[in-house]
Swiss-Prot record:
Gene name per UniProt: EPHA10
Cellular component, GO annotation: dendrite; extracellular region; membrane; plasma membrane
Source lineage: Eukaryota, Metazoa, Chordata, Craniata, Vertebrata
Residue spans, topological domain Cytoplasmic: 587-1008
Name recorded for this polypeptide: Ephrin type-A receptor 10
UniProt comment concerning the protein's domains: The protein kinase domain is predicted to be catalytically inactive.
Source organism of the structure: Homo sapiens
EC number: 2.7.10.1
Length: 1008
C-alpha cells in the first residue's frame, strides 16, 4: 500500500490535492432526519482493505484530517494508458432495517486538458455499481463474485482541478449523493469502475434515513425506518409517557415520511388526574394543588378551606368543620353550616288564631348561597319546663311550607287555644347534616295562645240527635274553681255541609253544652265551637276542628218499618244537591295553566276556558296561560346548581342575553358540553317572562330531533337555560360551509328527522311560528335538531319587514300569516317547504335578494321557488304541495315524514335530463321588479356598489357583460385579486341580485 510520499508525479499531485480537500471538508453536517450510518470510510483508522482489480488500478493511501486523525482514501490515475477497466469493491455492507439506501461520495477529479499527452485516453467520469447478497462475498475473490452488478450511475465532477489549482492550493471537492433500493437481501457490496480518469475517492458514506425517536404530545415514538417508496407514510403508534393516558378511541399516532420526518400527528396523551404537563413528561401536583380530570391541563390550587397534603392529589379534602355538598364539584370551596337566624320575631292573631314569624338571615352563611330555613313546632304544657314539649303533629299547618324555606317569614295555622308553643327556626345550607334542624344552630320563640278550648274531635259528645235538633257537650277548658272558670262563654257556629261557610248560624252559651234546634231533617250539618276567656278584654279564640252530625229523617223517629223509598228519595235529593254544588264550583273555576293547541283561534280559547280537559302527555302547556311561570318551569325542567355549570367561551348574544359554551358536571355523570343561555341582568320583566316561557316550552319536548333541555338555573342572580351543545351551529351556515361536499342523497337524508320532529310537535298541538334553517342546529354527529322556541304571538308584527341582518321572516311565512297574522300547523308546513328548499340549495337565501315586500307580492301572484340544482322532481313536487295557497290543501307533517322516508329509502330515478325537463310557466316573466334597477354596463354596476376601483380588474379578466358577471363565483373574485373580505361580500351580494334579475327575465319560477 502506497502513501502520499510515492514517487509517481501524478499520484503525488493527486494525493496532495485530495488530502487538502479532505482537511477542509471537516465533519459532515446532518440534516433534520436521523441518518443510520452503514459505512463511513472516514471513520476507519485502519486500512479499508477493499478489493481492487487489477492490482495496478485503484490503490489505498493514507493521510490525516484537520484534527490530525488518519483517514483512508482510494485513488487511480492511469490516464496515459488506453482501455482502462479498474474495479474497486467495498466490503459487505449490512443494510440493517433500511430499504432505501443513500450513497454519498466525496471525490476530486483532474481536468484531462491539464494533463499533457492524455487527450485520447483520459476520462472525466467513473461508474458506481452495487450488488445485493445475503452474505459477504469475501476478499480476493473474482470481481464481484461473477454476479452481474446493478449500475447506480455514472459520476461526473461539477468541478475538476488543474495543475495551476494545485499550485495555488485551490480546493475543488465534489460531493454526489445517489440512492439505491428498495433492497430485499441482507446486505450489498458497492463497486467503483474507473475507465481512465484521474480520480481520488476521499470519502464513501452509506446510510439510510429514519424518523428519530421523539416525544410529542406526551407520547413517545420509537425510531422508525422510512419506507422505500417516497409517497409512503409509515403509521407508528405512540406510547403515553408515565402518568398520562390517551383519549378513548383515539390513541396517539404519527406517520414517518420517506425523508425521515415525522408527519401528520393524530391524537395525544393527557396527564392523568393528579399530574400536570411539564415539557415532555407529567409531574405530580405538589401539596396544596390538585387536578381532578385529565381534561384539565394544569394543577389548580386547592379551593378555600381545603387542603392537599400529598403529591399527585386528585382532590382537596376539607378542613375541620368544613365540608362539600354532594352536588358541589371538586373545584368548589369547602363551606360550613350557617349560624342561627337573627332577630326572630312573632305576632299572634287571636281571631283567627294565627302565629306569624319573621327573622333576619344568619350572620354567617357558611360561605354558601343556598341557605334555607326549617321550622320545628313543639307543643308544651301550660306549666313546666320546655323539655316537657312534644311535636305539634300534622294538625298545625305551615305557610308557605315547613322546610326548604327561602323566604324569611312563615305562618302557623290551626294552633290550639290555651296552649304554649315553642317554635324553632333553623338555618340550613348544602352542607348541613340531616339532624341540623334539631341541632344548636336555631333561633326559637315560645308563645302562649291563652286560655281556650283546645278540643279534639272525639272530646265533643253527640248527646242527642233528632230530626230537627242536635244536643252537644264538651269538657270545660278551664278546670272548675280556677280563676275565670265561671266567666267562660262559648260560641257555636253551624251550617249545612256543602254550603259556603259564610252562610252560617251562631248560638252562644255559658255552659259546656248546647242544643241547636230548627234544623232540617235528614241533613248533614257542620258544627264548630270556640271559647271566649276573660281578661283585660274578651279575646276570641279560634274554632275547634269541625265535626259533622246528620239529623234523623222524619220517618226514622216514628217507625222503623217505614218504606225505604223515602230514604232513597232523600239520598237522591242530597246527591243532586252535592252534584249541583260541584258543578257550580267547576263553572267558576279558573285554572292557572291552560292545556291546548298553541295556535288555536279565539273560538278554541273560549272552549278551553269553559271546559275542563285532563292534560295528557302529548298535550302542549301554553306558557301564556300560566299564572306562575316559574312554578310551571319546575314541573318540566330540572333545576341545576349554578356551580355545576362552568362557562368556557362566549358564542355571542341571544334574544335575552349572552349565549355561552360551557360544561355541565352532574354527580355520577361525565362532564357534558352544553350551551348556556343567560338572562342579562338588565332584562325587563317581559324579557324575564319570555325567558321562562322558552324554558317551559323546551322542557315539554322529548324527541331525538329537537334540541334537548338539560336543565335550568332559576335560583340566584342569573337565570340560565342549559341545553345540549350543537357544535356545527345553524343548518344554513353549515350547508354554506360545505357547499359542493354533499350529494343530493346526503342532503335529503337530513329531512326525515326534521319532519319527524315537526310531526311530534304538531301532534302535541304546538305551532313553531319561526321555522327556518337558521333555527335548525347541527350536532357533532351531523344530527339536525329543531330549535328557536323563543318566538311567540308577540313576534307576529315582524313578519312583513326585512331585518337589519337581511333575513326577512316573510321569506318563510305562509300567505295567511302575512295577511292575517294567523299561525297554525299548516303555516308551519309552508315554512318546512322553505327549509327543504334551503337544504337542497346549500343554505342559499330563499328568493335570493328580493325584499320582503317583493316576496309577498310574488307569492300572492303565484310565484314559487324553482327546484335547486340536482333536486329530485319528487322532492320539488312535495315543496310545491307545502306551498299551496289554501292551508287545507297542504299535507300534514305525518304525510311529509312518510313521503321523505320513502324518498330516502328509494330515491326517484331521473325521468329526463335537466335540460329537457319541461318547466311550468311563471307569471313573473312579464313583470319587472323595481327592486333591481337596470344597469347599462359592468362599470355602472360597480359604481352602484361603490366599488368602481375594480373596473380594470373585471375588464382585464373578460367580464364585459352583466350576464357574465351574474355567473361569477366567490373563487372568481379571489382570482381577480380582490383580497378584502367585505368587498368580496358586497360583490357577491350584488351578483346574487343580478342572478335573481336573470331568473326573473328568464321566467324560471314555478306557477301554482
Amino acid at each position: 500500500m502506497e502513501t502520499c510520499a510515492g514517487p509517481h508525479p501524478l499520484r503525488l499531485f493527486l494525493c496532495r490535492m485530495q488530502l487538502c480537500l479532505a482537511l477542509l471538508l471537516g465533519p459532515w453536517r446532518p440534516g433534520t432526519a436521523e441518518e443510520v450510518i452503514l459505512l463511513d470510510s472516514k471513520a476507519s483508522q485502519a486500512e479499508l482493505g477493499w478489493t481492487a482489480l487489477p492490482s495496478n488500478g485503484w490503490e489505498e493511501i493514507s493521510g490525516v484530517d484537520e484534527h490530525d486523525r488518519p483517514i483512508r482514501t482510494y485513488q487511480v490515475c492511469n490516464v496515459l494508458e488506453p482501455n482502462q477497466d479498474n474495479w474497486l469493491q467495498t466490503g459487505w455492507i449490512s443494510r440493517g432495517r433500511g430499504q432505501r439506501i443513500f450513497v454519498e461520495l466525496q471525490f476530486t477529479l483532474r481536468d484531462c486538458s491539464s494533463i499533457p499527452g492524455a487527450a485520447g485516453t483520459c476520462k472525466e467520469t467513473f461508474n458506481v455499481y452495487y450488488l445485493e447478497t445475503e452474505a459477504d462475498l469475501g476478499r480476493g475473490r473474482p470481481r464481484l463474485g461473477g454476479s452481474r452488478p446493478r449500475k447506480i450511475d455514472t459520476i461526473a465532477a461539477d468541478e475538476s482541478f488543474t495543475q495551476g489549482d494545485l499550485g495555488e492550493r485551490k480546493m475543488k471537492l465534489n460531493t454526489e449523493v445517489r440512492e439505491i433500493g428498495p433492497l430485499s437481501r441482507r446486505g450489498f457490496h458497492l463497486a467503483f469502475q474507473d475507465v481512465g480518469a484521474c480520480v481520488a475517492l476521499v470519502s464513501v458514506r452509506v446510510y439510510y434515513k429514519q424518523c428519530r425517536a421523539t416525544v410529542r404530545g406526551l407520547a413517545t415514538f420509537p425510531a422508525t425506518a422510512a419506507e422505500s417508496a417516497f409517497s409512503t407514510l409509515v403509521e407508528v403508534a405512540g406510547t403515553c409517557v408515565a402518568h398520562s393516558e390517551g383519549e378513548p378511541g383515539s390513541p396517539p399516532r404519527m406517520h414517518c415520511g420517506a425523508d425521515g420526518e415525522w408527519l401528520v400527528p393524530v391524537g395525544r396523551c393527557s396527564c392523568s388526574a393528579g399530574f400536570q404537563e411539564r415539557g415532555d413528561f407529567c409531574e405530580a401536583c405538589p401539596p396544596g394543588f390538585y387536578k381532578v380530570s385529565p381534561r384539565r391541563p394544569l394543577c389548580s390550587p386547592c379551593p378555600e378551606h381545603s387542603r392537599a397534603l400529598e403529591n399527585a392529589s386528585t382532590f382537596c379534602v376539607c378542613q375541620d368543620s368544613y365540608a362539600r355538598s354532594p352536588t358541589d364539584p371538586p373545584s368548589a370551596s369547602c363551606t360550613r353550616p350557617p349560624s342561627a337566624p337573627r332577630d326572630l320575631q312573632y305576632s299572634l292573631s287571636r281571631s283567627p288564631l294565627v302565629l306569624r314569624l319573621r327573622w333576619l338571615p344568619p350572620a354567617d352563611s357558611g360561605g354558601r348561597s343556598d341557605v334555607t330555613y326549617s321550622l320545628l313546632c313543639l307543643r308544651c304544657g301550660r306549666e313546666g319546663p320546655a323539655g316537657a314539649c312534644e311535636p305539634c303533629g300534622p294538625r298545625v299547618a305551615f305557610l308557605p311550607r315547613q322546610a326548604g324555606l327561602r323566604e324569611r317569614a312563615a305562618t302557623l295555622l290551626h294552633l290550639r287555644p290555651g296552649a304554649r308553643y315553642t317554635v324553632r327556626v333553623a338555618a340550613l345550607n348544602g352542607v348541613s347534616g340531616p339532624a341540623a334542624a334539631a341541632g344548636t344552630t336555631y333561633a326559637q320563640v315560645t308563645v302562649s295562645t291563652g286560655p281556650g278550648a283546645p278540643w279534639e274531635e272525639d272530646e265533643i259528645r253527640r248527646d242527642r240527635v233528632e230530626p230537627q235538633s242536635v244536643s252537644l257537650s264538651w269538657r270545660e277548658p278551664i278546670p272548675a274553681g280556677a280563676p275565670g272558670a265561671n266567666d267562660t262563654e262559648y260560641e257555636i257556629r253551624y251550617y249545612e255541609k256543602g254550603q259556603s261557610e259564610q252562610t252560617y248560624s251562631m248560638v252562644k252559651t255559658g255552659a259546656p253544652t248546647v242544643t241547636v234546634t230548627n234544623l232540617k231533617p235528614a241533613t248533614r250539618y257542620v258544627f264548630q265551637i270556640r271559647a271566649a276567656s276573660p281578661g283585660p278584654s274578651w279575646e276570641a279564640q279560634s274554632f275547634n276542628p269541625s265535626i259533622e252530625v246528620q239529623t234523623l229523617g222524619e220517618a226514622a223517629s216514628g217507625s222503623r218499618d217505614q218504606s225505604p223509598a223515602i230514604v232513597v228519595t232523600v239520598v237522591t235529593i242530597s246527591a243532586l244537591l252535592v252534584l249541583g254544588s260541584v258543578m257550580s264550583v267547576l263553572a267558576i273555576w279558573r285554572r292557572p295553566c291552560s292545556y291546548g293547541k298553541g295556535g288555536g283561534d279565539a273560538h278554541d280559547e273560549e272552549e278551553l276556558y269553559f271546559h275542563f280537559k285532563v292534560p295528557t302527555r302529548r298535550t302542549f302547556l301554553d306558557p301564556q296561560s300560566c299564572g306562575d311561570l316559574l312554578q310551571a318551569v319546575h314541573l318540566f325542567a330540572k333545576e341545576l346548581d349554578a356551580k355545576s355549570v362552568t362557562l368556557e367561551r362566549s358564542l355571542g348574544g341571544g334574544r335575552f342575553g349572552e349565549l355561552c359554551c360551557g360544561c355541565l358536571q352532574l354527580p355520577g355523570r361525565q362532564e357534558l358540553l352544553v350551551a348556556v343561555h343567560m338572562l342579562r341582568d338588565s332584562a325587563s320583566d317581559s324579557q324575564r317572562l319570555g325567558f321562562l316561557a322558552e324554558a317551559l316550552t323546551l322542557g315539554q319536548f322529548d324527541h331525538s330531533h329537537i334540541v334537548r333541555l338539560e336543565g335550568v338555573v332559576t335560583r340566584g342572580s342569573t337565570l340560565m337555560i342549559v341545553t345540549e351543545y350543537m357544535s356545527h351551529g345553524a343548518l344554513d351556515g353549515f350547508l354554506r360551509r360545505h357547499e359542493g361536499q354533499l350529494v343530493a342523497g346526503q342532503l335529503m337524508g337530513l329531512l326525515p328527522g326534521l319532519a319527524s320532529a315537526m310531526k311530534y310537535l304538531s301532534e302535541m298541538g304546538y305551532v313553531h311560528r319561526g321555522l327556518a334553517a337558521r333555527h335548525v342546529l347541527v350536532s357533532s354527529d351531523l344530527v339536525c335538531k329543531i330549535s328557536g322556541f323563543g318566538r311567540g304571538p308577540r313576534d307576529r308584527s315582524e313578519a312583513v319587514y326585512t331585518t337589519m341582518s337581511g333575513r326577512s321572516p316573510a321569506l318563510w311565512a305562509a300567505p295567511e300569516t302575512l295577511q292575517f297574522g294567523h299561525f297554525s300547523s299548516a303555516s308551519d308546513v309552508w315554512s318546512f317547504g322553505i327549509i327543504m328548499w334551503e337544504v337542497m340549495a346549500f343554505g342559499e337565501r330563499p328568493y335570493w335578494d328580493m325584499s320582503g315586500q317583493d316576496v309577498i307580492k310574488a307569492v300572492e301572484d303565484g310565484f314559487r321557488l324553482p327546484p335547486p340544482r340536482n333536486c329530485p322532481n319528487l322532492l320539488h313536487r312535495l315543496m310545491l304541495d307545502c306551498w299551496q295557497k289554501d292551508p287545507g290543501e297542504r299535507p300534514r307533517f305525518s304525510q311529509i315524514h312518510s313521503i321523505l322516508s320513502k324518498m330516502v329509502q328509494d330515491p326517484e330515478p331521473p325521468k329526463c335530463a335537466l335540460t329537457t325537463c319541461p318547466r311550468p310557466p311563471t307569471p313573473l316573466a312579464d313583470r319587472a321588479f323595481s327592486t333591481f334597477p337596470s344597469f347599462g354596463s359592468v362599470g355602472a354596476w360597480l359604481e352602484a356598489l361603490d366599488l368602481c376601483r375594480y373596473k380594470d380588474s373585471f375588464a382585464a379578466a373578460g367580464y364585459g357583460s352583466l350576464e357574465a358577471v351574474a355567473e361569477m363565483t366567490a373563487q372568481d373574485l379571489v382570482s381577480l385579486g380582490i383580497s378584502l373580505a367585505e368587498h368580496r361580500e358586497a360583490l357577491l351580494s350584488g351578483i346574487s341580485a343580478l342572478q335573481a334579475r336573470v331568473l326573473q327575465l328568464q321566467g324560471q319560477g314555478v306557477q301554482v
